[in-house]
From Swiss-Prot:
Keyword Cell cycle on entry: yes
The protein's assembly and partners: Homodimer. Interacts with FtsZ.
GO cellular component: cell division site; cell septum; cytosol; plasma membrane
Biological source species: Lysinibacillus sphaericus (strain C3-41)
Cited Pfam families: ZapA
GO process terms (BP): division septum assembly; FtsZ-dependent cytokinesis; septin ring assembly
Function: Activator of cell division through the inhibition of FtsZ GTPase activity, therefore promoting FtsZ assembly into bundles of protofilaments necessary for the formation of the division Z ring. It is recruited early at mid-cell but it is not essential for cell division.
This protein's name: Cell division protein ZapA
Length: 86
């Protein structure tokens, strides 16, 4: 089995620089970092008194919540598709 080369980049999230390492494309990793940064900034608008650690946790909680809702919706759609196929 051929070992895939890991990509390494530096990204900025909410004013801090982080090193990211992964098998995904650099573009994908930059997109992930950009979405996290955007979500943290959005959370800050509604919760300006939170420090960056609490803001990061709130962002993570909201992101996992959204992910679970999407998984539930996917399961519903898969069930509907099964019924339609008979």
């Amino acid at each position: 089995m051929e070992k895939q080369e890991k990509n390494k980049i530096s990204v900025e999230i909410y004013g801090h620089t982080y090193k990211m390492v992964g098998l995904e494309s650099i573009g994908h990793m930059r997109l992930v970092a950009s979405i996290v940064d955007d979500r943290m900034r959005e959370m800050n608008v509604h919760n300006p008194s939170l420090d960056s650690t609490k803001l990061a946790v709130l962002t993570a909680v909201n992101t996992v919540h959204d992910n679970l809702l999407l998984k539930e919706r996917l399961e519903q759609l898969e069930e509907e598709l099964k019924k339609l196929k008979g």
